[in-house]
């Protein structure tokens, strides 16, 4: 069996059907005795150029190991499925299981946003604490002033 990297683009109006498509294609590979080494759903993204006046598509990446029959079945399914705008199949020398650069970049961006949100929340909490402490000290000063006048 050989290793393949497959990327296919799904019409944006059919995005809700992507999990079903992925399940169908992975089961076709597994039923033929192959295996899926990596599966990444990149989501809806801007395309480099428009296809049939469509500017966005749902991207899916699969790294599989399968025989010729299973690959032929997959490419036939891609060809006759109107929801698939483009597909690309590349033969690889070995199985690729690590995250793709796109997935890594998205993960880093999410982590950066989370860190920035945490910092902002901590800063807001710190300023809130300072305000409450200054209000408490101001109240204490006014209460001591009023008690001093009564005596």
Swiss-Prot record:
CDD domains named in the record: bS6
GO cellular component, as recorded: cytosolic small ribosomal subunit
Annotated region described as Disordered, given as residue ranges: 98-151
Entry-linked Pfam families: Ribosomal_S6 (PF01250)
Keywords attached to this entry: Ribonucleoprotein, Ribosomal protein, RNA-binding, rRNA-binding
Biological process (GO), any one: translation
Residue spans of biased composition, Acidic residues class: 135-151
Gene3D superfamilies the UniProt entry points to: 3.30.70.60
Stored InterPro entries: Ribosomal_bS6 (IPR000529), Ribosomal_bS6_sf (IPR035980), Ribosomal_S6_plastid/chlpt (IPR020814), Transl_elong_EF1B/ribsomal_bS6 (IPR014717)
Entry superkingdom: Bacteria
PANTHER family associated with the record: MITOCHONDRIAL 28S RIBOSOMAL PROTEIN S6 (PTHR21011), SMALL RIBOSOMAL SUBUNIT PROTEIN BS6M (PTHR21011:SF1)
Function according to Swiss-Prot or TrEMBL: Binds together with bS18 to 16S ribosomal RNA.
HAMAP family membership: Ribosomal_bS6
Family: Belongs to the bacterial ribosomal protein bS6 family.
Name of the molecule in the record: Small ribosomal subunit protein bS6
Gene that specifies this protein: rpsF
